[in-house]
Amino acid sequence: MKKRHLLSLLALGISTACYGETYPAPIGPSQSDFGGVGLLQTPTARMAREGELSLNYRDNDQYRYYSASVQLFPWLETTLRYTDVRTRQYSSVEAFSGDQTYKDKAFDLKLRLWEESYWLPQVAVGARDIGGTGLFDAEYLVASKAWGPFDFTLGLGWGYLGTSGNVKNPLCSASDKYCYRDNSYKQAGSIDGSQMFHGPASLFGGVEYQTPWQPLRLKLEYEGNNYQQDFAGKLEQKSKFNVGAIYRVTDWADVNLSYERGNTFMFGVTLRTNFNDLRPSYNDNARPQYQPQPQDAILQHSVVANQLTLLKYNAGLADPQIQAKGDTLYVTGEQVKYRDSREGIIRANRIVMNDLPDGIKTIRITENRLNMPQVTTETDVASLKNHLAGEPLGHETTLAQKRVEPVVPQSTEQGWYIDKSRFDFHIDPVLNQSVGGPENFYMYQLGVMGTADLWLTDHLLTTGSLFANLANNYDKFNYTNPPQDSHLPRVRTHVREYVQNDVYVNNLQANYFQHLGNGFYGQVYGGYLETMFGGAGAEVLYRPLDSNWAFGLDANYVKQRDWRSAKDMMKFTDYSVKTGHLTAYWTPSFAQDVLVKASVGQYLAGDKGGTLEIAKRFDSGVVVGGYATITNVSKEEYGEGDFTKGVYVSVPLDLFSSGPTRSRAAIGWTPLTRDGGQQLGRKFQLYDMTSDRSVNFR
């Protein structure tokens, strides 16, 4: 009887430990040493919240891991990583890389196959070091199941995760080819799926425990790597069990300490934010109160002057115009203040409703961009009046408002406007960065860019920008020779010579913009179009209003700018090329926050092919995207990297500014700059200039 009571008490204690309220809910998945949600050396099937960005640093005697992990979708995790191999030099040539240690770059993906249920675990499949050198490449299938404060994981790994070979590769039963894996190191940037899930396989697993003290979590794992093939050298492994602790300092920071291989300490830090949760915190003028004043059919000059001022400074409409025609009031202007133009429409409607001319039944607000009309928002006055005055509870109606093709009436006697500013000048800070170079891991250039715009007519714009260097560490550049593994024209690999000039004209050009009607827009341009090329070109875009697709075509003839000095950059070399692309834009109906962009055409090196770009927009307006270009240039002719690819993050500056703004800043990462698959960097692209024609993607 006593034994039975003892077992009952033990079972009750376990049940209480697993389900009692003394154990708080886990505060979210944690990052592994390699970046991405996991235990220590091994991954789990868990995913972070959609939009989560984690910046990670881990350090031990042999390696430093720098990684950035983004949860693009609830089912897809992406990770970029640089591994500093502390025991190896970048190269054996001191004049080339000095005493810098070897840096290996990698890209990882993890895909959730299904979510956890009451009985079934969450399951994911993933791959590490895709398109890298193969130093740390691995594939895995992993399952995770929570039980109270414990989260258990069991997985099967190949490659770096499976070198101990503690189980037979199950795929060997399908074909003997899966029993062998080529472990020779590959050329960086090459994507070779032929070795995936090949070679020795190992089981791995572990548990993460949420302690009663919520900031603290403990980890225990069993790993399948034997460290006998590590690039840092054969590493002693006294134990296959690793233990660690993670402490959440704040909502946005974790610190980590672990003891791995039975002989090595690892420590690190994780900084995080969520792109879906970021919100602007600027101070802004309040929306105008609805205080209607009776007006005659023709507005008084003092009244309309006040309206125009409010439209410009409160509603954010630059160059505002007001015009009455029949029973319709027309308002036009360019939204330069609010990223979400709906806010500007709300404010503009209130402004004109407070002093609405007698007899007006409809308000039409047309938004312009670069003097090209984009969209007209048409609102019924009676419906708007009811909404602004307030409707009885239970009797609310839908505002009678719709977006239509831009309507711009001919000038009448009842028209008022604020004179357009034909000239604009501004200075912006510029930070150019390069990560992973041979001379220094981090290269930077801090400078300022002065930009001047002058409208010669309503459609003809002249614009130029001058860059001035303030500080950089480009004195470390000591290698500007052409790539030895490629014979393509050097359309981009002269970048080091260009940026070493302290002052240079970045661009100087003339643009003619025209709204062609029925969803068509066009531009022609000529001059110094970007840092490395000048010439002339044209673009036409067909973008139906609020459609989830669009098509564009651009054609250009350009010559390469000289790079030898700032003065020589105003001259051209003998190299010229015709370049242009047919581009399709698509926002899937099942994923309104995703933009797919596909281009085909001829690139700057004369190669022909296509580019696929996919971008995800989060609730905050942050956009994360990636692209890849394949052309008719062979891998051997292209050189290291095989093809052009990269990722970028575009951040709306109103998340950090003291006031609303439509400006954005972009950060890009390209594993390696080569000459194949390179597009012309045009300052104005019509799809970006017509973003107000879409209610979904801005």
Swiss-Prot record:
Query: What is any one of the record's Gene Ontology cellular component terms?
Result: plasma membrane
InterPro entries associated with the record: YbjH
> Where is the signal peptide, in residue numbers?
1-17
The answer to keyword Transmembrane helix applying to this record is no
How is this protein situated with respect to the membrane? Lipid-anchor
Please give the Pfam families that the UniProt record associates with this protein.
YjbH
Q: Where is this chain lipid-modified, annotation N-palmitoyl cysteine?
A: C18
Q: Where is the lipid attached (S-diacylglycerol cysteine)?
A: C18
Subcellular location per UniProt equals: Cell membrane
- In the UniProt record, does the keyword Ribosomal protein occur? no
* Principal localisation: membrane
Keywords, A to Z, come to:
Cell membrane, Lipoprotein, Membrane, Palmitate, Signal
- Give the protein family: To E.coli YmcA.
Q: What is this protein called?
A: Uncharacterized lipoprotein YjbH
Q: Which organism is it from?
A: Escherichia coli (strain K12)
Name of the gene: yjbH
